[in-house]
Structure formats: structure tokens, C-alpha cells
């Protein structure tokens, strides 16, 4: 039994040394520490003012909140960052070359830490709603890679956040796979199965201190559903309903994985409104507002995920009705929620968002014009490659019509044509299964591209001539170059 040191955030920040690697809990802003990283950022600014440096390596489960990524990036306190981010200040620092960023599939992050591929982890900073004297840590609204961080870090600091009730105990299913060789299978055959424990057990001597906090997750709200996202959602729902009618999906449906954001929320709402789609389960990364609404409506029966990334009003609703949600929700580590083994076994319908798609079905999820990072690949690759059905969505126009997300060739490749089965935009659906590259190109141009760009893309296809893959190196990036030169892809000129 042990009494842990009670620290202020500033005292905790004093324990961190320049050049150390700090692993933070959180998967999205859900469950991410707030007080300690903000204090580290403030201390870094103080050190810089005195001619000294305090910069750290930052590892997380995924993106975090403004008090972590935002504060540290603004202070210039991040040496390197992995595996995913979504903060404007950090994105700017990465794209300006001031912060080294390593993008990776989220399912692989915990094992990369355990294998030592990312070097030693000096500190783990973990948000918890409870910690016992014998070292049992109950997490808050996400799991992410926190179990691995706790076990591999030399020392642990805990933010004990009173905003999250201790009644969260029991919502988590903590399990770490064995490392190779002879790793055993994950014994999870249904979305609702449990294979682990409800808390993280650590040696209490590793816990260097506890900082008491009371702060909500820094999850922003979602935009209202637009006509474009509504149409994308309707197209997804109608396509899936059609798959049931054709006998290509079971009548009882299959578990769903959905990305996060405005389009994902619109897709889930449309699926909930579609009478031809029966109540379904979800095995996903991020459980967001739309999932909770569908659960209350009886459309989602059970949701397993890595984080409860919902707006604060929705989170308060969940906590106020926690016994209603207890048998319907489970939070898992990201190497379980995103495990390719489980994605294939459960037969997941995977629905993710693309930045751009080319006419062969290759997807760019991460970069603008091939150069500027947006966020990272996240879990889309984990799910897309192994799903029963792999769907990518995007609008048919961007930047007021000056950009076509449907292009001859993506400027950056994240998910190749071998992992992508269906493309859906507000214009329609391109089913790529069983199609040759030329057949895929025709389907994507005719069903997914905006009418303003179909003629241009048809011209490109004609120039490709007779070949297995309809590409011409001379013109593959003509639309991107036209935007770079004139600010409008419609100005593209192809050369013979």
C-alpha cells in the first residue's frame, strides 16, 4: 500500500528534463491530460527566455487537445511527435519543418513502443478517474495506448480528473497482446466480448505523483449537416441497403467502423434513418455523438471503441444515464480496437474519409497537394485493408469548386487500390470490386466526379491510351499543377 506524492501541475512539470520522451494518454482529446502538458509548455517558454531549452518527444494514442498538442506546439516544446495529430499549431510546426512527425497506423503504435522502435519512454502522463494504493489505474473517456505507456515508462504521473466519475469503472477492457514469437490469438469473436481487465495494474513505486484536476475533455462540436454531407450519408446508406437486398451483406448486417468528423456523423445519421438497415453493432476507434444518439434510438445495439469522443453536453448525458450505457459500451486499447485480426474476423464495414481519390481507386488521407500534412493516416489503413467492405467517402468539390478531390493520380498515397472497394461522393457510388483499372476509372469518373470535372477527367483517360493502368506520366499531376499556378484545377491543360 502506498501514498502517492500530491503535486501541482507546475511541480510535475519540473520533473521533466530536456530531450526526454513523454507518452501521454488520450485518443483524440478524450482522456488526454491537460494540466501537466500545459505546465510543461509554460516551463519551456521560461527556459527559452533564459537561453536554455526544454523540448521533449511526444507520443500519444492519436490526436489530443489544445492543452496538450496546442500548448506544447505553441511553446516550441516538441522535438518529435507520433502517431497522429489534429491541432492547427502543431500542424503548422510540422509543415514548417520545426517538429519532426512520424505518421503510422494507429494499431501499430503500442507494439512499436514495446519493441523499443521509438526509443525509451521516460515518463507516462495519464489521465485517470481513480487510482488505488496498490497501483490500479482506472482511465477516463479513452484508452488509446495508455496500458503500454504505463508498463514501458520509467515513471508515471497521473492527472486525477474529478470531472469524470468513478462510476466509469467497468467500462474499460484492458488487454495487451503478448509480443512475438508465438503471440496468441485475440479471443474476441463478438463486438461485446471482453478479454481483459477494467483497470491498468502497475507497480505503485513507478507512480511519481498525482495532480488533482477537474476539467472536461476539449472535444469541439461538429458542424451542422450540410447538403453535401447529407447526400454522401444518403448515398452510403442506400448503397448498404442495396447490398442487403442483393444478398451481399447478411440480413442481420455486420459491425460498422466509422471515421470521425462531420461527414462521418452525417453518414451514421443517414444509416440510422434508413429503415432498410437493421439495428447494428459498432467496432470502431472513436465513439462520437451520432453513435450515442443512435444508441438511445435503439439503432446501435452495442459499440466498442477506443475513445468516447463526444461533445461535453453529450458526455454529461452519458454520465447522467451511465447505467443505461453500461451494457452497451466498452472502451479498448487501440491495438485491440484497430487490430487487423479482429477487423477481419468480425467482418467490419469500414467507412472512412479521403482527402482525394484517383481514378484507379488510390486514396490520399493525409496530405494537401502532396506536401502539407493535415492529420495523419490514423486507423483508416488498419480497417480498410482488412474489412469485409471498405468504403471511402469525400465530397466531389472543394474550395468552392476550385479543387476536385477526384484526380488522375493522388499526390500522396495512403490506401492503395488493393485496399479500397467502394468510393462514395455526393454525386454517387463507384463499386470497384472485380473491376480492372480502366473499368474503375470509368466508374469513378461517371459516378463520383463532379460534372464540372468529368470532361477533364475523360480527356485524361483518353490520353492514357491502351494500357493496363490508365495513367500518363506527362499529365498525371496537371490538375494539381493548375491549382498551384492559377488557384483552379479547371485550368488544367493536358499535353499529348
Roles of regions detected by a PLM:
Residues 1-496:
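Conserved alpha/beta enzyme-core scaffold
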